[in-house]
Amino acid sequence: MNAYTKQKIGIFGLGKTGISVYEELKNKYDLIVYDDLKAKRDIFEKLFGNKLITILSDSRWQDLDKIVLSPGVPLTHEVVRIAHHFNIPIISDIDLLFEKSKNLKFIAITGTNGKSTTAALISHILNSNGLDYTVAGNIGVPALQAKASKDGYVLELSSFQLDLVKIFTVKVAVLLNITPDHLDRYQDMNGYIAAKAKIFDRMDKDSYAVINIDNDYCRKIFLLLQREQLIKLIPFSVTKILNNGISIVDDKIHDNNLTYKLPLNKNLQGLHNCENIAASYAVSKIIGVESKKILESISSFQSLHHRMQYIGSINNISFYNDSKATNAISALQSIKALDNIYWLAGGIPKEGGIEGIKPYFNKIKKAYFYGQAKTMFANTAKNIIDCVICDNLEYAFNIAYKDAVSDNTEIKNILLAPSCSSYDQFKNFEERGELFIKLSKNVIGSNYLLSNLRIFD
């Protein structure tokens, strides 16, 4: 018998996470469920019927043993108020996974940017070297739907998920970076920083914190943990060589007193990916993988879709899909990594637009702005870079490709780094990225076919 036997549990939020929680707990406990969005309730009803769907005003929400909250639900929501008023604990799907897998190792990664790539890279390194780690969490696979693992889990955790965990404890925690984000959910930066720092809660002297000390907010957390002396600390940097820690400087990995050449990988370009590599290297060493094996695995890593994803090249034009770059800070990382850029950007703009990218406009050959942000972005870029206002991404791509073909520069890059959310023209950033991939592959394929047909002329 476990802690949840015969308990009454409410599941609030019926997206991917809520559905995974329901499938985990059904037939074991007395459940009720709800979501504010009718579309989500309709999907649940189609899958499982409407018997358990219970509106919040129903008194059963006041008589629960626990509420499992989906991470997208703000902590100011009425369901949270009900839980607090009636002393009902709120837990998360991450806690449920931890409870049933306590004998396994948990590696968790958080940060404003780079989480998914780092989680995938760590998993790739470990699994390429005879271990069995499953990657899940905010990366797109709900924790409770992740395949069973023999050795452990690599979890990408957002601040929203960290807000909810109560018992989850990790062997290795990674803090990549912190920059302003989600300030519509948190009162100020201090609230956002505090949420990120929760990744280190409940860790002990046998646990490791891997922290980017180049980032001001992360460095403050590192210094606080250093004073407390409760866990083992491994700092990393991509701006200076550390005597005790991991550094990547001048295309070399510095591991305390050892130095290795940084492997070349087109899928891991840019300073931001050096941070991801440094963190992944540190974690892999902690788990017990030899340095040489780590470097080999870094070389063979294939990037995640929509995250600075190299699609291919034709006629000295390379295509990069960074559809996941939904804000300027994220887009800036891919822009820093390339030159002679034909830049596709647009959608629903975030606060500040692309102002933060202006110092790097010299890397952009021409910009193609589309969607709701097109006029705003063009006003920021005018008189600095050549730009075109477009109706949609496909039109922007076609004009950009035509311009790149007529450019005699030796190396050219067509980059989708939207700096916006996608919801004005797409369901999500994945759909946006898939269109870019399709357009890129069509161009690469047709050019390859033409070049081969000319052999027979």
From Swiss-Prot:
ATP binds at residues 111-117. It is found in: Cytoplasm. Belongs to the MurCDEF family. NCBIfam families: murD. The gene is murD. GO terms for molecular function: ATP binding; tetrahydrofolylpolyglutamate synthase activity; UDP-N-acetylmuramoylalanine-D-glutamate ligase activity. Pathway: Cell wall biogenesis; peptidoglycan biosynthesis. InterPro entries: Folylpolyglutamate_synth_CS, Mur-like_cat_sf, Mur_ligase_C_dom_sf, Mur_ligase_cen, MurD. It comes from the Bacteria. One of its GO terms (biological process) is peptidoglycan biosynthetic process. Its main location: cytoplasm. It catalyses: UDP-N-acetyl-alpha-D-muramoyl-L-alanine + D-glutamate + ATP = UDP-N-acetyl-alpha-D-muramoyl-L-alanyl-D-glutamate + ADP + phosphate + H(+). This is UDP-N-acetylmuramoylalanine--D-glutamate ligase. The keyword RNA-binding does not apply.
